[in-house]
Amino acid sequence: MSYVDAHFDRDSDIIRVVERKDGKRDFREYQAKYTFYHEDQRGKYKSVYGDPLTRIVCKSTKDFRKEVAINRDKKLFESDINPIFQCLSENYLNQDAPKLNIAFFDIETDFDPERGFADPSDPFMPITSISVYLQWMETMICLAVPPKTLTMDQAKKTLEGIENVMLFEKEGQMIDTFLTLIEDADILSGWNSEGYDIP
């Protein structure tokens, strides 16, 4: 079992981890642990400098903050460690990295001869096509709404013999299909996606 990503829900003190196991995505939840150490002459733990330390483990943000406040006059160690890293080191140390599912995509929009291309803040023109390469399937798929100059039948006839092209009557249907195709992607990468496709 190897992890892909993790999210820390501070409100519920739960760490949600996404794993890949046998090529499938799996979701796990762990109770957050807030661990830190403080100087204590009777402590059972040692710092890297040999100082005796006591270990404090809390299961909620509230308790953690309270314990840090109680011990604020002592020298603290590891009180700034994110609970996600603690969880990952306890549960996934020395695990192999997963084979990530990567999807590459590009979105094309219609063009208005008078106004030009639509800006993401004012998307006045519809999406006309989305191409997506699913690396884990080694498959390129093109989703498109036929141009206004062709009927659906004419567009289908034009595409005869070309694999992995899907035509749609409406932009919304095409977007729904795209979202379904990328559902199992761990990483999404796109051409000009940050500045335009996904503003």
Regions found by a protein language model. Give the residues of each.
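The two-metal-ion catalytic cores of nucleic-acid processing enzymes
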Residues: 1-199
